């Protein structure tokens, strides 16, 4: 038998402090019969109706004029499905009582959630439109184990926290309520009384859709359908395939010309996909698209990890964008940020009054570089929340890979901290063992559940084994950004050519560690912001030399082992730094403006991508010493480099770069194979606005010793240029 309803209990509902509503509301067995209790602020009358027959059963007594009703059905001993006819003055409506429905989360689900071993917690937590006992509605669930009370508030109840307090499951710390007649598209939040008695209004961490900033509510949205991985997409991700990535910030790639506002996902698909296809890129990498409050973070401070940002449209529209990329044969990579989150009050910070998602000690839980909070990777539920989010984007939107941001800040406890600002691990070391285990677990989950999907690490240190299998002690990533190569080569390219001879090793040192990891060569957004200048702006010399330097550098990069990544705008040598609030300077491609300098770089990048995809020596053996051989590595005086790229079937391409403005005629290079070498690329071609110094299409080897080899070729190396020479098939 149930306990009687006291005035204190009723008062607890109206001051929104009652944390156990199902102990009081709904149907309860008493000595007199079944008693029905309902809470509906401001209602005048309440009548119980049998749902199946529509028959009026009884009118409930109003025991508190604020809107609390109680009534007994004499001699009734069996619970039944009912509805409530509610009178508001002279108006009446029939509603379903959310407190007549049984719990929908089972013991196994609760155990898996608390253990952090549920593969797809987003199928259980959050807001799910569904049908229960023939009634459509939304089932809301929230993990907040230390809250005293949680209510669901939204469009459906005037954002009144008194109306729909939720059921607490102590085994898992999950609050639950099925809300009949709630529907897709409605806005909602969770209203909590935290462990300290403070009122908090929180967005849903598992929301599939969110409001556009500055509004912060979650939106009921359907769980996206599973997108199956295809064999073609799997193949395009493999390490022995050409991977050329176009990195894109959706808010500034191209904007509406009339009002400088964003294009939506569908408009972006109309313009971006054909452009990327035409340019020959194999992959698009989007800067983070999980919902985020501050435009200036570029998405790198997300709060709605399961919500595609509403800046550009709905989750369904984002799905269409990915689908159209796939239809064009382009794979999609998404930047993913599990390293930290902002402290906006509607977000994860102090979620239930405790440091639920973050660490309580700021030496572990506060990131001073970005004024953000660091996830507690040692907590099962948090680890599962994050790792499953990666799977969600891959499985539910068809994203082909993730690029994990700021890995170094995750795996080192002393990252950007001085002594006294960090806590050693249990062994006294600086490694964040929990974060390392989290990354291994996430990569295991990705590769076991979405075979063919890839993960890429932005890891800026020499941490060993980033791309090694986790079973061999590695982190389990497929690729790692080669930050060392990028920093060294850009430092070299910034130098006046007369000084480059003294820094020759900056262009060659990368081969010392080339085979330690599977690398991507990144010329990313980070290199064209915050006073670093554009890539073109980094190049020394007058206009001709700046463009020639950049073209030569691109040629060197596309010939060098490693997958390629280029941030938008760099494909046509935008002259100013990237600005996230403006479109790229597409007008620079008008040849009437500057004589075609920028158009020349655009043509070069397009040709580089096409040559890259069509020639196996340039991509097949990136991670094998069999695929590379230095031919000229020590000619610092002339700033000349030459190396051979090879494929498994014996195809060979020689890459020759001259990083001085002096043409090198009759320059002899030792070769491994006798034959004719055809010039398939020359960054100094007049087609790219170069000076057109070259080799008239082909050079033949001669039996003249050079660079320790019996045979050699004599070539003309253009000024500030890179040339590709392909061995002709016999």
Curated annotation (Swiss-Prot):
GO terms for biological process: glycogen biosynthetic process. Pfam families: Alpha-amylase, Alpha-amylase_C, CBM_48, GlgB_N. SUPFAM superfamilies: (Trans)glycosidases, E set domains, Glycosyl hydrolase domain. Signal peptide: none annotated. GO terms for molecular function: 1,4-alpha-glucan branching enzyme activity; cation binding; hydrolase activity, hydrolyzing O-glycosyl compounds. It catalyses: Transfers a segment of a (1->4)-alpha-D-glucan chain to a primary hydroxy group in a similar glucan chain. The active site is at residues 405, 458. The keyword Transferase applies. Catalyzes the formation of the alpha-1,6-glucosidic linkages in glycogen by scission of a 1,4-alpha-linked oligosaccharide from growing alpha-1,4-glucan chains and the subsequent attachment of the oligosaccharide to the alpha-1,6 position. Belongs to the glycosyl hydrolase 13 family. GlgB subfamily. Monomer. NCBIfam families: branching_enzym, PRK05402.1, PRK12313.1. This is 1,4-alpha-glucan branching enzyme GlgB. It comes from Haemophilus influenzae (strain PittGG). The gene is glgB.
């Amino acid at each position: 038998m149930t306990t009687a309803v006291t005035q204190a209990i009723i008062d607890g509902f109206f001051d929104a402090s009652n944390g156990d509503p199902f102990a009081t509301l709904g149907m309860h067995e008493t000595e007199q019969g079944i008693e029905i209790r309902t809470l509906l602020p401001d209602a005048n009358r309440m009548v119980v109706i049998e749902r199946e027959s529509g028959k009026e059963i009884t009118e409930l007594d109003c025991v508190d004029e604020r809107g609390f009703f109680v009534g007994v059905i004499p001699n009734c001993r069996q619970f039944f499905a009912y509805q409530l006819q509610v009178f508001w003055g002279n108006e009446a409506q029939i509603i379903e009582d959310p407190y007549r429905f049984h719990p929908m989360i089972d013991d196994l689900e609760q155990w898996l959630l608390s253990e952090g071993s549920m593969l797809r917690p987003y199928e259980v937590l959050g807001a799910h439109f569904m049908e229960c006992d023939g009634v459509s509605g939304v089932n809301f669930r929230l993990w907040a184990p230390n809250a005293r009370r949680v209510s669901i508030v939204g469009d459906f109840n005037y954002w009144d926290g008194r109306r729909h307090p939720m059921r607490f499951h102590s085994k898992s710390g999950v609050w639950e309520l099925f809300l009949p007649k709630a529907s897709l598209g409605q806005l909602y939040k969770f209203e909590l009384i935290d462990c300290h008695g403070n009122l908090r209004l929180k967005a849903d961490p598992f929301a599939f859709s969110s409001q556009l900033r500055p509004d912060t509510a979650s939106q009921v949205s359907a769980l996206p359908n599973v997108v199956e991985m295809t064999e073609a997409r799997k193949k395009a991700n493999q390490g022995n395939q050409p991977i050329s990535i176009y990195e894109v910030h959706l808010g500034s790639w191209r904007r509406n010309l009339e009002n400088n506002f964003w294009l939506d996902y569908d408009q972006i698909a109309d313009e971006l996909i054909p452009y990327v296809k035409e340019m020959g890129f194999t992959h698009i990498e989007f800067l983070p698209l999980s919902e985020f409050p501050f435009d200036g973070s570029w998405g790198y401070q997300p709060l709605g990890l399961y919500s595609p940002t509403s800046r550009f449209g709905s989750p369904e529209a984002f799905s269409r964008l990915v689908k159209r990329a796939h239809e064009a044969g382009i794979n999609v990579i998404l930047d993913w940020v599990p390293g930290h989150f902002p402290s906006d009050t509607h977000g994860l910070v102090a979620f239930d009054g405790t440091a639920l998602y973050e660490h309580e000690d700021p030496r572990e839980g506060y990131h001073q570089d970005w004024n953000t909070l660091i996830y507690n990777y040692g907590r099962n539920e948090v680890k599962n929340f994050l790792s499953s989010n990666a799977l969600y984007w891959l499985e539910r939107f068809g994203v082909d890979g993730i690029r994990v941001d700021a890995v170094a800040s995750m795996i080192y406890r002393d990252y950007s901290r001085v002594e006294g600002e960090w806590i050693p691990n249990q062994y006294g070391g600086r490694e964040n063992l929990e974060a390392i285990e989290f990354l291994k677990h996430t990569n295991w989950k990705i590769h076991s559940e979405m075979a063919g999907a890839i993960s890429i690490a932005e890891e800026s240190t020499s941490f060993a084994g980033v791309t090694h299998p986790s079973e061999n002690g590695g982190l389990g990533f497929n690729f790692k950004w080669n930050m060392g190569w990028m920093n060294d080569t850009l430092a070299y390219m910034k130098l006046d050519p007369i000084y480059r001879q003294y820094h020759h090793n900056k262009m060659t040192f990368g081969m010392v560690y080339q085979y330690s990891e599977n690398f991507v060569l990144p010329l990313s957004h980070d290199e064209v912001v915050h006073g670093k200048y554009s890539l073109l702006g980094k190049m020394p010399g007058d206009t001709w030399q700046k463009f020639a330097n950049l073209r030569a550098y691109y040629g060197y990069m596309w010939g060098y082992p490693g997958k390629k990544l280029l941030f938008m705008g760099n494909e046509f040598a935008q002259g100013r730094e990237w600005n996230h609030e403006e479109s790229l300077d597409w007008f620079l491609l008008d040849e009437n403006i500057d004589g075609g300098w920028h158009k020349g770089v655009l043509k070069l990048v397009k040709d580089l991508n096409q040559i890259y995809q069509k020639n196996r020596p340039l991509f097949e053996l990136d991670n094998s010493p069999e695929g590379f051989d230095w031919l000229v590595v020590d000619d610092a005086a002339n700033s000349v480099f030459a190396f051979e790229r090879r494929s498994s079937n014996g195809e060979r391409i020689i890459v020759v770069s001259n990083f001085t403005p002096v043409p090198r005629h009759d320059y002899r290079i030792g070769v491994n194979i006798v034959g004719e070498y055809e010039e398939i690329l020359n960054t100094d071609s007049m087609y790219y606005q170069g000076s057109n110094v070259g080799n008239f299409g082909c050079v033949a080897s001669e039996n003249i010793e050079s660079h320790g080899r019996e045979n050699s070729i004599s070539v003309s190396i253009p000024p500030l240029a890179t040339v590709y020479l392909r061995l002709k098939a016999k």
